[in-house]
Curated annotation (Swiss-Prot), chains A, B:
Disulfide bonding pattern of the chain: none
Listed cofactors: Zn(2+)
Protein localization: Apical cell membrane; Cytoplasm
Organism expressing this protein natively: Danio rerio (Zebrafish)
Entry annotated with the keyword Membrane: yes
Complex and partners: Homotetramer.
Any one GO cellular component localisation term in the record: cytosol
Record-linked InterPro entries: AspA/AstE_fam (IPR050178), Aspartoacylase (IPR016708), AstE_AspA_cat (IPR055438), Aste_AspA_hybrid_dom (IPR007036)
Protein name: N-acyl-aromatic-L-amino acid amidohydrolase (carboxylate-forming) A
PANTHER family: ASPARTOACYLASE, N-ACYL-AROMATIC-L-AMINO ACID AMIDOHYDROLASE (CARBOXYLATE-FORMING)
Principal location: membrane
Residues reported in the UniProt entry to bind substrate: 74, 81-82, 189, 300
Family as reported in the entry's similarity comment: Belongs to the AspA/AstE family. Aspartoacylase subfamily.
Top-level EC class as recorded in UniProt: hydrolase
């Protein structure tokens, strides 16, 4: 066999992977991101009405931060979606522990324990953003074929809005998002939607993405071969803050109207970034063209982030199919 | 003189009104409506840099709810923009009084006292809404010629977004909004903008409206005659709540995609109102066609309001000019 043919054969060969036990669908990790809150409540209503058989695979539904949901706030004491690193999950709990640290450890026991063999196969954590990001799937690894195949599937099936994949690509123990507790999975961001508001159009897109994820897992477990190919992903590079008053730290400018709502565009040196409150334009000074995202996300003002920047690259994923007694 | 001619003469005659002492521009009455917060801060920066002469009339700037602004929340204890009725303003203050009741009484002493001769001539209270309401001027009286003339002026001058006038038309003593403290004035609503976010496009529109208000007062005080004519206004009729679960009171539906973002359209019997979280459409059952506004406003979920309904009517305002020694 020539080298070329061997490579071709290698490309075509399926990677055999274990069947997936099911999925945990989590909403309200941030209590004021309402599409996920109402979707989880709707799924729980469906289960009550029609029993577990409503889905073809085991589905766990979780309202992640019930106290924040009740108060319609992002969080009570601290951002829970920064509490799922190994370090925070192993912090001893005391009377003064933030509510979200306690709740994160509870969720880790329910869905994990992170890093152990018993963790959930997949978490799909539902979020909204005030940014015009369409449907964005965020996850931690550039080599998790199951997750990347689901992303690819959603990209093929959802046509109403752009579906993009964002890879953070840092060690899983340092990963601080809820979905990092499970073997596979992703954060599902849908926007634009204001905090404390549910928009039917955004809710419908989120529901379609969750239904398709369940659909993919069912098909995979049933033996469907998912063909490999290229997946275009965005990789986080750096964050950019708003211009601020050096003394008060108050913002002195807003995102420029020419950048607002243009998440994932190609931002080049000289392009407008900010419009100051007195009317001056601040332009981009980056040497390399990059893709901005989470542009003017409401929750990031306090984090000192006006937007993130990403680089686009292409991942090649192999074909995958479920491991059976014969294939194992 | 015939009756017709007398009527004609009456129409043409100017109403002479006292010069206006200035305007109070208030932002952050709701702490997470950021355009007004940043506009007031910018005006204060300009005054610091260039002195009081920066405006041709006396301008007072007020950050109405500084604690809520600091926490980026609508309010701390209670909605302050419901605290300016005579009843709440005269409630005795105790240790357990809500922060906003105390602050409303402070503001009433600063800008009022409501109902007395010493009140500010005009308050312009800056707000944002998550609804697609463009620029909406809200005020209490259908016969306040000064305010209606400023509305008319803004309608003529601002072309980027629709400028609409909403009249609540109930007794001034019961009126609970901050602007009701002054002789004239209005609440200036600009949207759509998420809570906790400032969008440059929305900020620029709000700034233009405030600049034009100052401009109108200056021209009026300088003797300009403002010609009378018709002003189209919307009058509040009733509120409509979301469909809710009878037990939990949770929402069971969101505003329908065909209604979302269509504030001030004409809503007729049979038009879609809501889309339930399981996919069913709820339609309008009103006998009379009406105009919905504040559609899906984030702050109104807790108030049990999915949208308000209004009726459109036309007000005829007379020409106005400033009272001088000669004319008085």
């Amino acid at each position: 066999m020539t080298e070329e043919k061997a490579e071709e054969k290698n490309k075509m060969a399926s990677v055999f992977l274990p069947a997936l036990g099911g999925v945990a669908v989590c909403g309200g990790t941030h209590g004021n991101e309402l599409s996920g809150v109402y979707l989880v409540q709707e799924m729980e209503r469906q289960r009550k009405e029609r029993g577990d058989g409503v889905w073809p695979i085991p589905v766990t539904t979780v309202l992640s931060n019930p106290r924040a949901v009740k108060e319609c706030r992002r969080y009570i004491d601290t951002d829970m979606n920064r509490c799922f690193s190994k370090a925070v999950l192993s912090t001893p709990i005391t009377d003064s522990s933030p509510y979200e640290v306690r709740r994160a450890q509870e969720l880790n026991n329910l869905l994990g324990v992170k890093g152990s063999d018993d963790v959930m196969d997949m978490i799909c954590d539902l979020h909204n953003t005030t940014s015009n990001m369409g449907l964005t799937l965020i996850h931690y690894s550039a080599s998790d074929w199951v997750t990347l195949h689901i992303c690819k599937y959603l990209q093929t099936k959802i046509t109403k809005v752009p579906v993009r994949v964002l890879v953070l690509d840092f060690p899983i123990n340092d990963a601080y998002n809820l979905e990092s507790v499970s073997k596979h999975g992703f954060t599902l961001e849908v926007g634009p939607q204001p905090q404390g508001v549910v928009r039917a159009d955004i809710y419908v897109i989120m529901k379609e993405a969750v239904d398709l994820t369940i659909d993919w897992i069912h098909k995979f477990n049933s033996g469907t071969v998912f063909e490999g190919g290229d997946v275009e992903v965005f990789k986080f590079i750096k964050s950019v803050d708003y211009p601020r008053d050096p003394e008060t730290r108050n913002l002195t400018a807003a995102v420029h109207p020419q950048l607002q709502d243009r998440d994932f565009c190609l931002l080049k040196r000289g392009d407008p970034l900010f419009l100051s409150f007195s009317g001056e334009t601040v332009t981009c000074e980056e040497e390399e063209p990059l893709h901005p995202f989470f542009i003017n996300e409401g929750a990031y003002y306090e984090k000192g982030i006006a937007f993130h920047l990403a680089k686009k690259w292409t991942l090649t994923v192999p074909s995958v199919q479920v491991q059976t007694t014969n294939s194992a």
